[in-house]
Regions:
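Flexible beta->alpha loop and helix N-cap segments adjacent to enzyme active/binding sites
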Residues: 1-207
């Protein structure tokens, strides 16, 4: 574990707070449920952002310290995927295993996750598969009309995916990720006052 820098990171438990932050172009780290294995982050150890912003890719490349040419991905509510992407015979893409062609609606509305060849590596999500992540995106859709979030793995270039809460905080503090979302139903075993004392963390309070 590398030394913490002492940069203040807000930890949010309320999904409405996170939706407001996304709408205001804030980068959010998501830490919940079991850890993730495999090549993709699927909403448990993810960094999310507003995909409507054309500069999203260049911004995230800077934040993650990774090569400019690598494509990014998105997570979309399953019930809306056919409005945005040519799925062909695919009914869903829960493991983010396929790059699919973007429809004109996607090119216009979510340019931040569309690669230069007009494809996107997309993850579909249902409430049954990941209730908290689905609920976050659904609330974002209800507020903005966009049923998609920019989704990339919660790590910096050349590093492993975060595992523990300390890993997540450390990654935030060594980057420009200033907000961490831990859903309200997730147990945090470290007392809040110790997080504040050790890592200079503030727990964001809902209005």
């Amino acid at each position: 574990m590398k030394t913490m820098t002492g940069i203040i990171t807000d930890i949010h438990r309320d999904v409405d707070d996170v939706v407001n932050l996304l709408e205001n172009a804030q980068i959010i780290g998501v830490w919940q449920n079991h850890s993730e294995i495999g090549p993709r982050a699927l909403g448990n150890r993810s960094i999310i952002f507003d995909p409507r912003m054309p500069e999203a890719k260049s911004l995230m490349n800077t934040v993650k310290k990774r090569e400019w040419f690598r494509p990014f991905a998105g997570t979309i509510l399953l019930e809306h995927v056919h409005d945005y992407f040519e799925m062909l015979q695919l009914k869903e893409s829960p493991w983010m295993s396929f790059a699919v062609k973007a429809k004109p609606k996607a090119l216009k509305e979510i340019p931040g996750i569309i690669h230069h060849d007009e494809t996107c590596r997309i993850q579909t999500v249902t409430e049954e598969q990941n209730p908290n992540y689905y609920n976050l995106i659904k609330k974002f859709y209800e507020k903005t009309g966009c049923p998609v979030v920019f989704n990339t793995s919660f790590n910096l270039g050349g590093e492993a995916l975060v595992e523990t809460l300390e890993d997540a905080i450390d990654t935030c503090n060594r980057s420009d990720i200033n907000h961490l979302y831990i859903p309200e139903d997730q147990e945090v075993n470290v007392p809040w006052h110790l997080l504040k004392e050790k890592y200079h963390i503030e727990r964001a309070e809902s209005d």
